[in-house]
Amino acid sequence: MSKELSKTYDPKDIEDRLYKKWEDNGYFHAEVDRSKKPFTIVMPPPNITGQLHMGHALDNTMQDILIRYKRMQGYNALWQPGTDHASIATEVKVIQSLKEQGINKADLTREEFLDKCWEWRKEYGGRIVKQLRKLGSSADWQRERFTMDEGCSHAVQEVFTKLYKKGWIYKGSRIVNWCPVCKTSISDAEVEHEEQDGFFWHINYPVVGEEGRFVEIATTRPETLFGDTAVAVNPEDERYKDIVGKTLKLPMTDREIPVIADAYVDKEFGTGCVKITPAHDPNDFEVGKRHNLEEIVVINDDATMNEKAGKYAGMDRYECRKALVDDLKKEGLLVKVVPHSHNVGVHDRCHTTVEPMIKQQWFVKMDEMIKPAVEGVKNGEIKLLPSRMDKTYFNWTDNIRDWCISRQLWWGHRIPAWYCDDCGEMVVSIENPGKCPKCGCTHMTQDPDTLDTWFSSALWPFSTLGWPEKTEDLDYFYPNDVLVTGYDIIFFWVIRMIFSGYEQMGKAPFHTVLFHGLVRDSQGRKMSKSLGNGIDPLEVIDKYGADALRLTLITGNAPGNDMRFYWERVEASRNFANKVWNASRFIMMNLDGFELHTPSKDELHAADKWILSKVNTLAKDATENMDKFELGIAVQKVYDFIWDEFCDWYIEIAKVRTYKKDEDPVSANAALWTLKTVLTEALKLLHPYMPFITEEIFCTLQSEEETIMLSKWPEYKEEWNFPAEEAAIEHCKDLVKGIRNVRTEMDVPPSRKAKLYITSEDAGLRTVFEENKEVYVNLASTSEIIVQADKNGISEDAVSVVIPGAVLYLPLEDLVDFEKEKERLHKEKDKLTKELARSKGMLSNEKFLNNAKPEKVQEEKDKLAKYEQMMAQVEARLAQMK
């Protein structure tokens, strides 16, 4: 071997170097190759304002694992990266930056402001991409896209104009969610609902012409009273049948409003009378449409009251509320105030309370657009993992409203609509139409609004591949295979990609959506700036390495479930990396200078066949788990195999043979060949999770290989199936564990070797122990081994160890307290009594017998038989000691 591993593993020595090697050699890049099957994942584009956080780290680690796995399986694997222009977030950042320079946005033209945005993007937009590289992400950076690059922008304009011509995009006055701080409309998906303590203000509305008669309404928002255009009651409510059609005096105004009957009103809720404010409530808006009510906007874009509020004009909405309530009380119209907890909509970005108000906005009509997206999940064309996400998905699609896509911002895709300066005629066109088709005027002004950021993101799976052009990339790599994303953006992005894929491409954009949960702190709290509990992934990488972070994020992680982050787990992952490194160094040191050849099956020892059989089964099991997207389960199996079976058992068993290269070269060769072969297989199985350390070790171990990344993923080999040897070595392991346990209990140091008697009535098992003494002679610290059918010739003071199928005896004579041994056996008996009770309880449970898989039931029956045998042996030993 021309190269050696350093004595200690330091991620800083290898990670940047290896990543540069991978990128320089184009290992991440994918081109159309019809001889290979494609596998495509599109990266959820991080915002250009973003910095790598734990959510990004988990999301991209999962994607990278799948891409590396499929690449090793021989697929033409494309991981399509890119970033999102993030209109609101970027605009806020740029405005802050300008403010620090003493510049106000209002002092700039639109073009000047956009220049500042592009400058900001150039300076900061690539930051998160560099951070994703530090994580080891093997995305095809040669194909990196941006949601506002020329190709993506063309796709956005194409979709907008197509949907407009189809009648599925329209402009109209509707209730929208208005953010008074960001001063833009936002979609329903961008509204979070927080439970807040508020009040019901009960207010009397005087009945016109009937002195002293009032209709009592209850409202949580008295300041919207100025926009009331009716009071509604349920037509079935007997209490109010006589006032339907009458007129009420609207308090604190000189207006009168009618009493109407509408089934929308819940007669059991509140007073059964509801103030109707069509311009400031989505439900009231619908009632207003049914009854042809006037829509009166009373709140300005900045959440101050307008002139319709009379003397309260100019006040903030909450100041108005307080002043109005005081005045209603003075007028004797405030009946009572009742505490009330209710959900309040807030903007998910700035957490300002959203103001529902009527605005002229652009909308996507959803009633027809959503149908294929619903059917695609129902018929299994698209699979959501975990399956419980189906309920969340359908809950949203069943209650979907038209999507408000216009935003009152400058940074983003400008709406391709043009208005005639003379007659106001509107034309939707990608290019400026030049002249008005109605009056011929040549002065056309573009709509000032931009599109919701998620409009362009919804096209991401196909716009990144060249759509609307019919490119070879699009034909080959679309549809994508898997989408990996957090469950928190199922409404923002996942559903919109699905219906956009069906509408524009005629097929689903991917066949599987793998959801992951949030990464929380060790106390289960969401990481946030306000709590100060955020953990920077780059800090973790700097301290422990990217591989340790990746392993920590995936181990024990189940699809859709939140996970807790513990520093102790990162340390454990780092310790695992050290163990892999040290084991590899030991193997390579012993291989150095030795001419290795492939041994015949007869030259392999039982332990060699056992570990080959184990890694063979691991390859099969891990592949099955990976194919089912059970990444956490797969890596746990790989981890356990490497740490336990390979390092703690096989290396220790084989170690003695590696020292006998001259004395027994055939045996040494078989051991060294097995060590190298199994380590190679294990490194490949570990590579998708821990790419850096596996690359460094693999390329040192297999110096003729370029990279582990393009090596073949391990497959199950029938010739490595050795069930008899597996069973034999497991018996030997039971023996070693039993002896080690009793030595620990008796405080007998490993250096003190003892004679070992193995008794078993099973002749086949006796043969196993006779033929495999080399496996356990050193691990059990024995001086002499005697295998026999019974305990003839064994001294009475010998300490016994009961293992499945056999009893071990260690004649420790005066080293062991006889009474202490009896105490130990009684403890063992108590332990077995509990296990027997548990096992019998399960096997007498009808629910378990009927619902559990047959193999599970059989497994429990086998356990019971084993416990019963062990109990008989313990009781026999106790009887002998009386």
Residue ranges of each PLM-predicted region?
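Non-catalytic terminal extensions that flank enzyme cores
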Residues: 1-54, 77, 335, 348, ...
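Residue patterns forming the tRNA-binding/recognition surfaces of aminoacyl-tRNA synthetases
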Residues: 3, 8, 17, 21-25, ...
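N-terminal catalytic cores of NTP/NDP-binding nucleotidyl/phosphoryl-transfer enzymes
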Residues: 31-94, 147, 156, 217-219, ...
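Short, solvent-exposed turn/loop segments enriched in Gly/Ser/Thr/Pro and often Arg
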Residues: 34-36, 44-45, 80-91, 144-152, ...
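Extended active-site and interfacial segments that coordinate phosphate-rich ligands
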Residues: 57-65, 215-251, 274-281, 291-298, ...
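Secondary-structure transition/capping motifs at alpha-helix termini
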Residues: 68-76, 97-110, 130, 134-139, ...
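Feature 926 captures the class I aminoacyl-tRNA synthetase adenylation module centered on the KMSKS loop
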Residues: 202, 395-455, 459, 503-546, ...
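Active-site-adjacent "gating/activation" loops or surface patches in catalytic cores
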Residues: 254-260, 448-478, 644, 648-651
